[in-house]
């Protein structure tokens, strides 16, 4: 960050504030990045902020106070996040030169050792919980998609997670052809596609597994697994993420299912479940050590079934799969 680029930067995105200060706001908060950074938060959050933040905290009642402060201090140029709420933008547009600066999203791509440890813990919790669930036994007993999703969420919290990374996906039968289908109150069928994760101290995990039964399902599973494995084999520092997407996509296309691979090959994650870079054909971000990404190729045959396999990968001298959960 070049201090000459702007006089002050306004941060309102909760996870950017947590990244900088370790304070997770529960209501509206503003981080002002300048020579002496400060977090402004409501009276309701003051006690929490004082206990957790590494950046000085001040109480404020309304954003108008901040606007008046800018005027008094002679602020001329303000940097903002692209996600700045529109009501705040309207209060400052026209009075100052504004420039979008999303440098924190780039900075957050490289994880510290502490962040990697938290991610590894989240993965360990989610995988332990999955094993305790025993999905195939649940199917034999006639469990529903809803019941399995609820129990897996409970197990992750019981084992130390603060919450789920996202709404757990348990889809089966023809529902599995929808990549982000909602769980239904119906008994599990085959295949069973599961996508789940949890948070530990704010950091996310994300895993997908598919349980197949018929010969056709096994054939698709093997294609997806080949794309998954070869994409991971190609990972190393210096590689563009679009090249990884191309590897996975080309394998699936060779088998004639290119049009059935309807999402990107993966994404980065950390405090947010989806962070930069996106492992897609349009993203030319170059991999660096200590990035954490997912690899999740999938094939979805409309009204029949879908298969997705997803693992988290740490970029070291090569791609290192995080966790030890078997795929088969």
Task: Tell me the role of every PLM-derived stretch.
Residues 1-328:
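Active-site neighborhoods and metal-handling regions in enzymes and metal-associated proteins
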